[in-house]
Curated annotation (Swiss-Prot):
GO biological process: defense response to bacterium; killing of cells of another organism
Coiled coil region boundaries: none
S-S bridge residues: C9-C14
Principal location: secreted
Any one Gene Ontology cellular component term annotated for this protein: extracellular region
Protein's cellular compartments: Secreted
InterPro entries per the UniProt record, alphabetical: Bacteriocin_IIa (IPR002633), Bacteriocin_IIa_CS (IPR023384), Bacteriocin_IIa_dom_sf (IPR023388)
Name of this protein: Bacteriocin leucocin-C
Keywords on record: Antibiotic, Antimicrobial, Bacteriocin, Disulfide bond, Secreted
Amino acid sequence: KNYGNGVHCTKKGCSVDWGYAWTNIANNSVMNGLTGGNAGWHN
């Protein structure tokens, strides 16, 4: 499964494209904070 934030998972585990993920993690953290968890990873 590809979570669209630089993280993709298989049956063996998950891996992260850190260059892509850090931008999204930062954006999602801010948006999750502002919306009480209704944005970013939880949409």
